[in-house]
Amino acid sequence: MMQLLTAGGLEPLTDQVRTPDGSNPKGYFEYEPVKSLAQDQSWLPLARGKVVKVIVQLLQFLPTGLPCQVVLMQRDIDEVLESQATMLGKQLPASQAQTLKATFQRHWEQSRSRLESSPECSLLVVEHRNLLTRPETEITRLIEFFTPQQLKREEMRRVVDPTLYRSRTSGESP
């Protein structure tokens, strides 16, 4: 998503500390201070007008009253767990996977609910699978969401790479 928004013309807030690797060959687009959002929000003014990658577990620590636009990625949790296992080189025991799955789902639902009820926040939910299988539809939604900025449709279209959709729960190809 970060690559897509950047290609569209939005400026990312990133420090490039975490470099591309085999799990994410196009980069991570992370900003280290985000990891401490629960304890330190002093960096938030630097994010004004930029796109910032924030994992769902940390969204609850965005200050109340902060005007923002949030693109919330929805991805099949089994695909997330499979992707993490591949990246880490180990599978979780089934009981741990179930607990993690329930925790992740709870965080995602709580974050969505909080963002939807926040009058100063605009929210767009994008399904990961749809982005890779129907990119044109999702790109149009993103362009409409970020209006009045003029996102570059062609550049966004070019960066969608279905070959990076390696962990999927069904045998379908994107």
Q: How would you name each of these model-derived features?
A:
Residues 49-151:
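PAPS-dependent sulfotransferase catalytic domain
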Residues 1-50, 158-171:
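PAPS-dependent sulfotransferase catalytic core
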